[in-house]
């Protein structure tokens, strides 16, 4: 910038003709320096930004509503999943931001944020699977609409992509799922006709998740609710499913907690029950789940 000011000052001075006459080579060198140091990097930067993006592709970008059952209440959060394909050699993830376009609200995650999980695709070394959970909206559930996801690497370059979030469960209605465990059986109650997904048994993925005492996953068992022998219509709008826990306890003796996970057919939302102890008679104090 000082070189630019020097050249401009020289051209605005009264003896500029003499300057050009006696110092043509100096002025030419100064102009060349300005061109190389100021103009060329800007043009080159624009070309590199358009031709060599940080990520070749952002695949599988999804935003999913996650409803957590805690102490009789249901908290609405948002989870993000995206597969990033890096050019070689891959740069490191540094920063992620999610913006809701209508309100301009943003959620920012740095490189050391514990809510960000990064996994490497063993079959494709240039790919990273990035998962983010625990995003919360200040006023209840997240609004439906368009969101923009920005991912930046350690060099400051970034990729961005838009994604649409569908409608959530109606706020004025009580959340329709509940899961409970007693000494012998587990019980799941769910609506016969949920407002979001149509008939529950035909349009959801349901599974039981077994956890250790420190909440590590032991196993996940998909449920075929249509084939459970003890399913019943407990009211005109509620289905109740229940089954014995003996087989689960026998097969997974290191399991201590049981919880239920329900997803809609498009996997755009997920219900996660609070963990329940498989052995209620155990006097061990229960720590809060992470």
Swiss-Prot record:
Gene Ontology CC terms: plasma membrane
Principal place of residence: membrane
Keywords for the protein's UniProt record, in alphabetical order: Cell membrane, Membrane, Transmembrane, Transmembrane helix
Membrane topology type: Multi-pass membrane protein
Membrane-traversing stretches: 5-27, 34-56
Tagged with keyword Transmembrane helix: yes
Subcellular localization, as worded in the UniProt entry: Cell membrane
Protein name per the record: Uncharacterized protein TP_0465
């Amino acid at each position: 910038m000082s070189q630019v000011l020097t050249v401009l000052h020289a051209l605005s001075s009264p003896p500029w003709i003499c300057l050009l006459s006696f110092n043509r080579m100096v002025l030419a060198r100064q102009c060349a320096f300005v061109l190389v140091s100021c103009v060329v990097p800007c043009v080159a930067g624009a070309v590199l930004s358009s031709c060599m993006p940080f990520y070749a592709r952002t695949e599988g970008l999804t935003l999913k509503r996650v409803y957590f059952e805690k102490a009789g209440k249901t908290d609405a959060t948002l989870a993000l999943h995206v597969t990033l394909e890096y050019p070689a050699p891959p740069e490191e993830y540094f920063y992620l931001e999610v913006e809701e376009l209508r309100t301009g609200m943003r959620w920012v995650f740095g490189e050391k944020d514990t809510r960000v999980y990064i996994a490497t695709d063993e079959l494709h070394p240039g790919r990273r699977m990035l998962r983010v959970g625990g995003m919360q909206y200040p006023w209840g559930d997240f609004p439906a609409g368009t969101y923009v996801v920005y991912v930046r690497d350690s060099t400051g370059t970034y990729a961005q992509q838009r994604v649409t979030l569908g409608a959530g469960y109606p706020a004025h209605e009580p959340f329709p799922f509940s899961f409970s465990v007693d000494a012998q059986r587990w019980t799941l109650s769910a609506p016969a006709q949920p407002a979001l997904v149509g008939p529950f048994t035909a349009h959801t993925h349901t599974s039981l998740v077994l956890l250790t005492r420190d909440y590590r996953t032991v196993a996940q068992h998909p449920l075929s609710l249509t084939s459970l022998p003890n399913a019943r219509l407990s009211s005109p709008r509620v289905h109740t499913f229940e089954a014995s826990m003996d087989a689960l306890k026998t097969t997974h003796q290191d399991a201590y907690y049981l919880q239920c996970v329900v997803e809609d057919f498009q996997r755009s939302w997920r219900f996660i029950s609070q963990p329940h102890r498989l052995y209620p008679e155990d006097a061990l104090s229960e720590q809060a789940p992470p």
